[in-house]
A protein has these predicted regions:
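Terminal, compositionally biased segments used for targeting/anchoring and flexible tails
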Residues: 1-197
Length: 197
């Protein structure tokens, strides 16, 4: 790291500490609540999202609840959504393929999927997802047939989105753990589709 990068990192850390101190001083949030929220975010990962997808694949009633109210459904599985924007879930099927992007910055369902992949935050991904989504997906090896509608979903500060991908053929009889193991962050963003290894 260069000296300017180090200086920027130190400045950002000082600013974060100052904001936390002010929030605690004004009794807006306690240091324990801040630590709790950080721990929750750090614990979230694409594996957690994969478990949610797997449950929806094997439990039609949960799938229905997940598509109707993503926040409430994932809370059933122990995911803490307190303080997080609402979670919307869109389903890929034979007639529509969804692709999630945050056109303004990097709004992402961190409470469910953890930190966003580096490419999700890039200006290139954000622009191409809107301008040339089929070309972008092709670079990921995802070919959306001409007859399948491609829908771009904008994740925002007010509402976060994830994709419920199609369950791959040949997974009948698989348990939730095995199903969850094949689901990646890309599948829940819509740039890839789950594949059997």
């Amino acid at each position: 790291m260069s000296a300017p990068d180090d200086l920027l990192r130190v400045s950002a850390e000082r600013l974060l500490v100052a904001i936390r101190d002010i929030l605690a001083e004004k009794s807006i949030v306690s240091p324990a609540e801040i630590a709790d929220r950080i721990a929750i975010t750090e614990a979230a990962s694409p594996a957690q999202g994969g478990g949610i997808v797997a449950r929806a694949w094997v439990d039609p009633l949960f799938r229905q609840r997940l598509l109707g109210d993503g926040t409430r459904a994932v809370e059933e599985l122990g995911v803490v959504m307190r303080g997080a924007p609402p979670l919307g879930v869109v389903e890929n099927d034979g007639s529509v393929h969804h692709l999630v992007v945050c056109t303004l910055c990097s709004c992402y369902p961190r409470a469910v999927l953890g930190y966003p992949p580096f490419w999700f935050k890039s200006a290139s991904y954000r622009a191409r997802a809107v301008r040339d989504p089929r070309g972008l997906l092709a670079e990921w090896g995802t070919i959306v047939p001409a007859g399948v509608k491609l829908r771009i979903v904008d994740s925002t500060a007010d509402y976060r989105w994830m994709v419920l991908p199609r369950r791959p053929e040949g997974t009948d009889g698989w348990d939730e753990e095995r199903l969850a193991s094949i689901v990646t962050a890309g599948d829940m963003i819509g740039v890839t589709i789950p594949k059997i290894a």
